[in-house]
Amino acid sequence: MKILVLNAGSSSHKCCLYAIEGPLPDHPAPPLWEAQLDWHDPNHASLKVKTKRENLEEDLSDVSRADALSHLLTTLWHGPTQVIQMAQEINVVGHRVVHGGQDYQSSVVVTSEVKTAIADLIPLAPNHNPANLEGIKLIEQLLGNVRQVAVFDTAFHSHLPEVAAIYPGPYDWQQQGIRRYGFHGISHQYCTQRTAEILGRGVDRLIICHLGNGASLTAVKQGQSIDTSMGFTPLEGLMMGTRSGSIDPGILIHLMRQGYDADQLDHMLNKASGLKGISGVSHDLREIEQAIAQDNAQAKLARDLYLHRLKACLGSMLMSLGGVDVLVFTGGIGEHSASVRAETCEALAFLGLKLDPILNRKSPVDQDIAAVDSKVRVLVIKTQEDWAIAQSCYEQCC
């Protein structure tokens, strides 16, 4: 079976192709082909394609989104990165869909009803669901009636306990769909499964730290999400690359009274806050650490604030679980920043958590970096959302 995975965003398309023969393997299979399309402005994009044998890089000018994606897909069966003979070899296409609302608690085959539901949820995910829906429609145009599967980022959190899901506003907010949904669910679910594989056992109490440009924590009890830091939107929770995370809602009322409108507040909180907003340097923690080395006080404040908020939110997840048996770090920062892991774990030393400093500095993938005598295991996991989407497609089709 050949499975194409499409992760369509507002400014990029990421795709990969998997070939699965026989039963699903126990470990993630490497893709046959990977491609990324990044938009620099509405008519200009850059394309990168990677296969085992060849790499391809191109600049695309004066092209529509549909034409650019069509060109990207043709590199599957044409040119130096060809890995299949024709488009008809693709059996199924899986899509990451950020918001599935209350109705979609697992992956589903895309139908007209599903497309309508994704469109109806655009007000809850205006930066993501439109691009996800566009990706589905483009595949329909380019690949005809190939089966498509929607894999929802909210699904893993769809069974949150009421006390974790309901906001303490008016009770009728629930009828409006205003509740905690949680995000990064594909990553959190993958890490939950991968943790059990690495340790060779199920885990009772697990906290997953997905730390990238977007960041979230999830408390997992016996394989089920019971609390998570992102909420009604991916804006809630931790301080992130450009997002503020949780702030006093009274600040927004204050700014509205000063004349700010919804679009200005949206941009401020989603694009001009977080590490970028505080440091004035970058959303990238690596660049912030370079600025700190040059005695940039604002950059140091941004990093200190990032870690303070991370530790505070970890405390919340810890209380929801009543302790922790395994702590997982994933995402770009989680996987690669030994210093963030070390400083975070130092705050949990009272639990008997001890890192192996040598292993931590090596940032090993899919390994336990806790000391032998640590009472809490600490794993670094390379999240593989694309593979998780491919797994969902396989399960829908077999």
Curated annotation (Swiss-Prot):
One of its GO terms (molecular function) is magnesium ion binding. CDD domains: ASKHA_NBD_AcK_PK. Gene3D superfamilies: 3.30.420.40. GO terms for biological process: acetate metabolic process; acetyl-CoA biosynthetic process. Mg(2+) binds at N7, E385. Catalyzes the formation of acetyl phosphate from acetate and ATP. Can also catalyze the reverse reaction. Keywords: ATP-binding, Cytoplasm, Kinase, Magnesium, Metal-binding, Nucleotide-binding, Transferase. This is Acetate kinase. It is an enzyme of class 2 (transferase). GO terms for cellular component: cytoplasm. It catalyses: acetate + ATP = acetyl phosphate + ADP. It is found in: Cytoplasm. The record marks H184, R243 as: Transition state stabilizer. The active site is at D153 (proton donor/acceptor).
